[in-house]
Amino acid sequence: MPYRSRPDVGRQGRLSQPTVPKLPASLTAAKLPDDDLRDEGVCLSLEYVDADLSKRDVASVEIDRCRFKTVNFGRTELDRALISDSVFEGCDFANLRTRDCSLTRVSLASSRMTGVSWIQGSLRQVTFEGCRMDMASFRFSQFKSVVFSGCRLAQADFQEADLRGARFDRCDLTGAQFSKAQMEGTRFADCGLDGLNGVTSLRGSIITGRDALALVYSLAGALGITIEDD
């Protein structure tokens, strides 16, 4: 029987709060092209402001203890990137493509992530706050102590992802895909859950009463139940 890791939980059985990124007291201003993303490169203790890092194709880059403000990563492709103890604010990740990448102790806020493809990735101690993530894909990725807060995730794809360590607060998940996802202990609070796909995979998740009402029609459809008006 394959080993299945347990979600990060606190003493009361609730998902633990993500650890805040550990940034140094001062950061060095990044300068391009010297501090650009490159294969097997290391970005350490740097601050990128209004930089254009779009349309890059990079493998095995390491980003540690960095801050990114209003940086453009649109259409960049990352393979086996390691990103830790870093903060992203107001960045554009539209149509970013990644594979086998890792986020550890990372905060992303007020960023555009429409169409992001984060496949077979690892996310641990991560917060997404106020991000636009329509049609983002996290297929086959693993989430441990990850919080989505106030995010727009309409038609996002979590197919076969391990979401047992994830929490969704005040998120729009209209039409999101959860087929074959692992969701024991996944929490939803004040979320829009209309038209979910793979709704039977929510077995074991924790949902507020108000959110549960939105699942009635999706569950009925999945079970072949017809709901008639009185």
Which positions does each model-derived feature cover?
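Tandem repeat scaffolds
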Residues: P2-D230
